[in-house]
Amino acid sequence: MEIDPNYVNPKYSSLKSTVMNSEVLTSKYKSAIHHAGDGELEDDILAVMEELHSMLQEKGLACHTENLEVFSSTILHLKTTGQENRAGDLIAAILSFGCSISAQAIVPSTLLKTMSEMLDSFATRNHELKLITKDLQEVVPRQVLKAKKKSKAKSAEGPSASTEDIKDSDTKGNQDIGDNGDLNSSINQRNREICYKHYTTDEFEALSLEKRQEIMKYYIQYILGAWGYNATDPTKTAMLYDLIDKHTVITVMRQSKEGTLTSDDILMAIDEVIDSVNSMSSCYGGYKATIGNDNGTPYLVLIPKEGVILLSYPPPIPVTHHYYNKALSFIFPCAITIFSSPIYI
């Protein structure tokens, strides 16, 4: 028996159309999204589904909720991977295909077979795109978040700023600049949360809290060379834990264990932290990060806004990169505990 895609349970039939659209259809769409395993992108996919549904209605076309979810998740994936033109082409193709099918009045069985094949193809391509995106995330350097400066208020006589003008552009890495005078301001709290989520990874988050803290303390002191690091200071702790890229942490720690860590690798890791601190330290009180050098060994230097070096000074004994690579577990026993984790096997 064929089911009308626009069928609404009788108990909702007395509701106004606007209410039904916002309550009944939204509930159906969310159910389809979670059934497809895309719950983490619920809000984004839901917005595309509603927009595509509106376009189909304008053409007098109907689409089953499950099919609409597949189309919408594919369109969203194309948009988020920078393929806006292809997403537009896909929408146009869906509308054109629907209109041509309607005009030709194909018998239901043939239409069902055609749509099923099309749906299978979309599902396959969408899965392939997700795998490609995951691989790219592993090899492409993580984008450094940037703090955007506050613009001056526009004149009352001039054109007013539109919503799009003042809207945060998180996907481009631009955040409202922090308030150095108030670490607990809403802007600073929001930006710190964004920074943490941006620079962490699923693999790192899967570790226990104790293991994560142990790894980060070791990385900060012995890889970045921050020998003066004070782990009891919550502000410095939060800034370094948030702004250090956890993908780099895991990669470098594995290289250390395998004896393949080079001076260039350490220099790149320090430069990466310098970029992120100089971009977003305003929401941690304001610091300037730079690089120091002790007999050819680079180390991280953090200078607070007062101008006094607070963290990271030359280590008390000469440290060579051969020392980092070959004598790691012997000189620093904590490395043995860290590297015993299953993720480093």
UniProtKB/Swiss-Prot annotation:
It is found in: Virion. Signal peptide: none annotated. One of its GO terms (cellular component) is virion component. Residues 164-173 have a biased composition (Basic and acidic residues). GO terms for molecular function: structural constituent of virion. Residues 148-185 are annotated as: Disordered. The gene is M2. This is Matrix protein. Keywords: Viral matrix protein, Virion.
